[in-house]
Amino acid sequence: MPCRKESFLLLEQSVTVGSGEVDTLVARIGEALQLNAQRTPTSCSMAYGALKPVSRAGPSCSCVRGRSTPYPVCTPRGAARHAQHHHHHSPRQQGTGGNKRLCGRGWGRCNCRKHAGTEEEDDPHELLQELLLSGNLIKEAVRRLHMAGESPDPPGSRRVSECTETTVQ
């Protein structure tokens, strides 16, 4: 546990970085987003099983919002909560306001591009741009790093412990 405490102290310190270091960080995050996109299901509708894809004009959104994230996420962890939510209520009916769900701050219009009903995963660069514009890039990177720590490592990758820092070469 002391390692975790040190990492929080490190985050509280003010750090001055150059543009080159920021570019390197953005490149690393972009690579992590691409790698994670390759491991995730091809669409959110497939992760939810029998649920039909939601169109943009639909009255509800298939977004799942956890307590730790202020924006919608589509993960197997979130899918379990989503599926559990639907088991306790009546079947979905198009055009009714009864199945309205919050999509998180800033997503009030439920304009989630990744839930547009397409069968292909969004372009990782488009997702990176969305995260940059919404200000959630760091939160998404931390969430994905935590998820990567919970899942088994793919062959050929190296695991980073919580106590050490690594540098990009």
Swiss-Prot record:
This is GSK-3-binding protein. GO terms for cellular component: cytoplasm. PANTHER family: GBP PROTEIN (PTHR35154:SF3). InterPro entries: GSK3-bd. Keywords: Developmental protein. It holds the Pfam family GSK-3_bind. Residues 79-91 have a biased composition (Basic residues). One of its GO terms (biological process) is dorsal/ventral axis specification. Residues 75-100, 147-169 are annotated as: Disordered. Binds GSK-3 and prevents GSK-3-dependent phosphorylation. Regulates the stability of beta-catenin in embryos. Maternal GBP is required for dorsal-ventral axis formation. Belongs to the GSK-3-binding protein family. Residues 122-145 are annotated as: Involved in GSK-3 binding.
